[in-house]
């Protein structure tokens, strides 16, 4: 889904939620994503000790990838549980482990980098983050750079726009508006 809806001749851009969890319902798509995430991790990162998924959207794919790679899996909550052990990281993770974090979608990077910080605070090395999709918002790119985290994604906003043009969901004339929205979606004004 892209953040565009045509209403008559007026173009309306709204906040969009790219729900990658729906891909879990389609075995061929689910398997493709699992294989591609595993391929990226195998090619980009050496001597990985564990895979961590960001709750909740990346738990399932993270577990599938960890299983395929034969690695331990943990997941990272956005906030500690308020009962029981009150864990932020669920599963067995040893301090000093080299961890690749899997995320489903990166928008501003806030929740993703909070997960990175949780793993670092636990005493582990974050090798990098691999995600299914990113909007490529400038604020996220700057945040990942500041946090010194390598982010690799399977797809991105530009690829979605290219596919939307190719399949005639939008036409070339609408690309500039959609790219302008991406620069600062919170303050975007369609004028």
Each predicted region: which residue ranges?
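Short, glycine/charge-rich flexible loops or terminal/linker lids adjacent to PRPP-binding catalytic cores
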Residues: 62-100, 108-114
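Conserved acidic residues
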Residues: 49, 97, 127
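Single conserved hydrophobic/aromatic residue that forms the stacking wall/gate
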Residues: 1-8, 12-13
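PRPP-dependent phosphoribosyltransferase catalytic core
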Residues: 117-191
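Short glycine-rich phosphate-binding loop at a beta-alpha junction
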Residues: 46-55, 130
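A short, well-structured juxtamembrane/interface segment
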Residues: 29-48
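Glycine-rich phosphate-binding "P-loop"
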Residues: 16-31, 107
């Amino acid at each position: 889904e892209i953040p565009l809806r045509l209403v008559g001749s007026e173009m309306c851009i709204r906040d969009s939620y790219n729900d990658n969890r729906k891909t879990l319902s389609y075995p061929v798509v689910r398997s493709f994503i699992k294989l591609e995430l595993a391929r990226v991790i195998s090619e980009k990162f050496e001597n990985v000790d564990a895979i961590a998924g960001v709750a909740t959207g990346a738990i399932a794919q993270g577990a599938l990838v960890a299983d395929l790679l034969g690695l331990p899996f943990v997941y990272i909550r956005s906030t500690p549980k308020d009962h029981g052990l009150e864990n932020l990281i669920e599963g067995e993770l040893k301090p000093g482990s080299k961890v690749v974090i899997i995320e489903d979608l990166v928008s501003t990077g806030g929740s993703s980098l909070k997960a990175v910080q949780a793993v670092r605070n636990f005493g582990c090395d974050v090798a990098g983050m691999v995600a299914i999709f990113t909007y490529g918002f400038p604020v996220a790119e700057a945040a990942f750079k500041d946090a010194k985290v390598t982010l690799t994604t399977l797809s991105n906003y530009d690829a979605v726009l290219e596919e939307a043009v190719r399949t005639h969901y939008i036409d070339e004339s609408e690309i500039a508006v959609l790219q302008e929205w991406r620069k600062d979606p919170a303050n975007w004004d369609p004028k």
